[in-house]
A protein has these predicted regions:
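Terminal peptide-recognition signature
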Residues: 3, 34, 98, 127, ...
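Glycine-rich beta-strand-centered segment in the early N-terminal region that forms part
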Residues: 21-38, 50-92
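Cytochrome P450 core scaffold surrounding the K-helix E-X-X-R motif
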Residues: 42-48
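Short helix-loop-beta connector
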Residues: 80, 110-115, 136-142
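A structural motif shared across PLP-dependent enzymes of the aminotransferase-like
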Residues: 89-102
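Short peripheral tails and domain-boundary helices/loops at the edges of structured domains
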Residues: 104-121
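Mid-domain Rossmann-like dinucleotide-binding core that forms the NAD(H)/NADP(H) cofactor-binding site
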Residues: 120, 124-169
């Protein structure tokens, strides 16, 4: 299978595409045929060794993926071949097939585009945590969004409005 790999510290120009062996799921894991892999700011830092997590090279960047389950490992309940999923995996997403621990999977409903689904976890998850868990946002409050053009900024606008807040962006 094809994989985008980082073998040396540097920017996107240092990434290479190579053939690697396809993995097989172990106990508690599934194999996902990757439909899309979201690239986020931490991915750009990781390939430059500027992030707190530094996977051993060579590795594939890409921390969140969507796709279809291709194989299910022993002991995995609730998932089957053909299920549409998304997952936050930390790194390794820029491959044709990815091993994912079953507890990291989220089901993608029919009618939701897998490319769009791949970009939900980090951006929307970050803002749900910020607005609800940390900020305890209430209807009628005002949210100021500085930097509304990126994924997290756009998610903050949409979510703040959904929570009933007034948004200034």
């Amino acid at each position: 299978m094809k994989a985008v790999l980082t073998k040396e510290v540097g920017g996107p120009e240092t990434l290479v595409v190579e053939q690697i062996d396809a993995p097989a799921p172990a106990k508690g894991e599934v194999l996902v045929d990757v439909a899309a892999c979201a690239i986020n700011f931490p991915d750009t830092l990781m390939i430059r060794d500027l992030y707190q997590f530094k996977p051993e090279r060579p590795y594939s960047p890409g921390g969140e993926i969507s796709g279809t389950i291709a194989a299910v490992g022993e002991g995995v309940d609730g998932w089957q071949v053909g299920d549409r999923v998304l997952a936050g995996i930390g790194s390794g997403g820029l491959r044709e097939k990815v091993i994912v621990e079953a507890h990291r999977l989220f089901k993608v409903p029919q009618g939701i585009d897998l490319v769009e689904a791949s970009a939900l976890l980090m951006t929307y998850g970050t803002m749900i945590h910020a607005l609800k868990d940390r900020g305890d946002i209430k209807p009628g409050e005002t949210v100021l969004v500085l930097g509304a053009a990126g994924g997290v900024g756009l998610a903050s606008i949409e979510l703040a409005k959904a929570y009933g807040a007034k948004v200034v962006a």
